[in-house]
């Protein structure tokens, strides 16, 4: 009976969700970097304002990432 309980105990400890992790989980040491991408499709040309707006919307659809800069 003791051998059976020991075998069950060891098998339960072998699962990663039940066993204790030896690594420290200090999140303050991890650095998070955010990337921002500049939208290059839009050109600063006052003559083609409607075309620039279409290009801006097209850029936003391409970018799809809220971290992208340059979308209005």
Swiss-Prot record:
Q: Where in the cell is it found?
A: Secreted
The UniProt keywords, alphabetically, are: Disulfide bond, Enterotoxin, Secreted, Signal, Toxin, Transposable element, Virulence
Q: Which domain of life is it from?
A: Bacteria
Q: Which InterPro entries match?
A: Heat-stable_enterotox_CS, Heat-stable_enterotox_STa
Pfam families noted in UniProt = Enterotoxin_ST
What does UniProt give as the signal peptide span? 1-19
GO molecular function per UniProt: toxin activity
Prosequence residues removed at maturation: 20-54
Sorted alphabetically, the Gene Ontology cellular component annotations on this record are: extracellular space
The UniProt record lists the keyword Transmembrane: no
S-S bridge residues: 59-64, 60-68, 63-71
Q: Which family does it belong to?
A: Belongs to the heat-stable enterotoxin family.
Q: What's the stated role of this polypeptide?
A: Toxin which activates the particulate form of guanylate cyclase and increases cyclic GMP levels within the host intestinal epithelial cells.
Its recorded name reads: Heat-stable enterotoxin ST-IA/ST-P
Organism source for this protein?
A: Escherichia coli
> Lineage in the entry?
Bacteria, Pseudomonadati, Pseudomonadota, Gammaproteobacteria, Enterobacterales
């Amino acid at each position: 009976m003791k051998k059976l309980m020991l075998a069950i105990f060891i098998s339960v400890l072998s699962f990663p969700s039940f066993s204790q992790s030896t690594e420290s989980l200090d999140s303050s040491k991890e650095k998070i970097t955010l990337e921002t991408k500049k939208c290059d499709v839009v050109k600063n040309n006052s003559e083609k304002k409607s075309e620039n707006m279409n290009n801006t919307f097209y850029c936003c659809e391409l970018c799809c990432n809220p971290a992208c800069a340059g979308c209005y």
